[in-house]
Regions:
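Short, mixed-charge, low-aromatic patches
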Residues: 1-4, 40-49, 93-100
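Short, contiguous alpha-helical
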Residues: 7-22, 26-71, 110-171
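Active-site-proximal loop and beta-strand segments within enzyme catalytic domains
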Residues: 104-106
Length: 171
């Protein structure tokens, strides 16, 4: 996988993610579908910050999750979610810009409290823990939006609320 391909792949998903976060900023941030679930605001912040993790995968040979905080921040406003996401995107782009392709094939290890959990190439780590992880939680967030009776953006095709393409015209 090349750095150029990875950047294009990430950017395509970031565009869709921004559309979901644009809607989420107007949602009741404290709402939760279940007591065991994140609040909508906390889930949106998690989605917003994930792109910044690209830095951890392009620097050093490992990352220890046990050294982190207590999970996503609780936002005070929708504007904070969008600002966090914009900063995360900037950090992701900076981490990937100028990155040599061979660096992406180097080994990288995810750990928790010093215990290795998974070892893979940097490219696979970014694909799995940034891109696919963001897409997974973005999908959860679209369900939250639907349950709050907010419009779900068209992402890969039309949604029940938004058309991705204009309607076809009769010939």
């Amino acid at each position: 996988m090349t750095a150029h391909f990875l950047r294009q792949h990430l950017d395509a998903e970031l565009t869709a993610t921004r559309a979901v976060l644009d809607t989420a900023q107007h949602a009741p941030l404290g709402w939760t579908p279940h007591p065991a679930s994140f609040s909508l605001g906390r889930l949106a912040m998690h989605v917003a910050v994930i792109p910044s993790w690209t830095e951890a995968f392009t620097r050093g040979g490992s990352y220890d999750m046990g050294a982190g905080g207590s999970g996503p921040a609780v936002p005070v406003s929708g504007a904070e979610i969008l600002a966090t996401h914009e900063a995360a995107v900037t950090r992701a782009h900076a981490a990937l810009d100028g990155l040599a392709d061979p660096v992406l094939e180097e080994g990288w290890t995810l750990m928790r409290d010093g215990v290795p959990l998974a070892t893979m190439t940097r490219a696979e780590a970014i694909s799995r823990y940034v891109v696919r992880h963001m897409v997974h939680h973005r999908g959860q967030l679209t369900v939250y939006l639907r349950l709050c009776d907010l419009p779900v953006p068209a992402l890969y095709g039309d949604s029940a609320d938004r058309r991705l393409l204009p309607p076809e015209r009769p010939a």
